Amino acid sequence: PSEINDRMSSDQLKRLTPTFDGGFKLDYVRGTNDKPLPYIVNKTMMRIDPPAPIQPGGQFAFKIKWWYNINDRMEIGGRSGFEYFEEDDNYLYTIAQFFPRMAVYNDVEGWQNKQFLGRGEFTLPFGDYEVNITVPSDHLVAATGTLQNANDVLPREKRKKLEEARAEREMPVVIYSEEEARENEKTKSDKTKTWKFAAENVRDFAFASSRKFIWDAMGVEQSDGSVVMAMSMYPKEGNPLWERYSTKAVAHTLKWYSYYTFDYPYPVAWSIHAKSIGMEYPMICFNFGRPEKDGTYSERVKYGMIGVIIHEVGHNYFPMIVNSDERQWTWMDEGLNSFLQYLTEQQWERDYPSRRGPAYKIVDYMKGDKSKITPIMTNSESIYQFGNNAYGKPATALNILRETIMGRELFDYAFKVYANRWKFKHPSPADFFRTMEDASAVDLDWFWRGWYFTT
């Protein structure tokens, strides 16, 4: 009862039920000499005290042993967990935020130690990851990074299929078919396999695992000639929608986001189908969009699925590479990403029914109850009408700036300068405003003041 507050969401109340056991359990925190290190956990933040101050350019190595029980995402919500399929008694795991992650220390605010309250997402430093994932031997695994031991976990014919997919530009190549997935669902292996992944210069790591997965892939050629693998994994429940559109939407997103910003710097981009979620991580995202059980689907479901894939894959650029502070400023990734999502959707299909971007889409919000409207430059946890304010309004503002004030050519040049200047760095709102003005030689103070600092 002491954990119940006067104002709580339904998701927060669900987490108080017996099915949620409270998250991470820490077994120990030790130095490399195996001696315990002092630490304190304050809700979602943890402080570890090293034996001596870390000097500039110095290093501090330590070891943490922890564990937690994977939650039923469909019951208590959240960005990570499992979905259970009663019809065939199988699980689909989408796993994220599963390890203690470093906080950011930067030259503007020092340590970013704001608590995670749900809306304001994550602020993370870049790092290199080597991750071993041991799962039942009949599971397929998708993850941040490049698979290091394909010879150990994939048959030769599947590795050959992946090479064929790398050379394909028009249609995805099926690596594991629906027929294979259906057969795989019927039995459960009592053996395990360890999938090994490595990722460089990423701010996070996530993965998905299931014996239900269908897998398809194709190559996307960059301007420098390098090839990125656009890939999807999804259960049979996602078909026929997912086999028709998912990987094509991934490839389309990489093409057009790279056109407006920079070549995608990572080797793979995954789209994973999971019910009732749209969530992004480096090189991998979890996306909704499920047909009816008979395989039929509406235009709304179709475009919703394509749109969420474009949006979540697009997050690889903002904030996974242009690494803004999501905890503080949701609009810096969601708003910019929603703007590019709109441009990319219009390249997918003329008159694509975009939810955000066109000016008329924001009219009802802007003329609404002024007591329920906050400036875009409002902390992520204090925003009324979160979607309109952090996604729709900045997307509309940038669209107006591009179409009616700066013009497409000048805007696109300045926006690309911002993206390239701040990739693999931690920009603040002022860095975005200054760079757009600096690159275009246009004084936009009046525009930022009106659109971002007032209602």
What is the predicted role of each segment?
Residues 8-86, 90, 181-190, 194-195:
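A surface-exposed beta-strand-loop module
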Residues 42-44, 53, 65-71, 136, ...:
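An acidic- and aromatic-residue-enriched active-site/binding cleft used to recognize and process polar
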Residues 85, 176-185, 189, 430-439:
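Short, charged low-complexity linear motifs
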Residues 100-111, 117-310, 339:
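Hydrophobic helix-coil surface modules that form long, contiguous segments used
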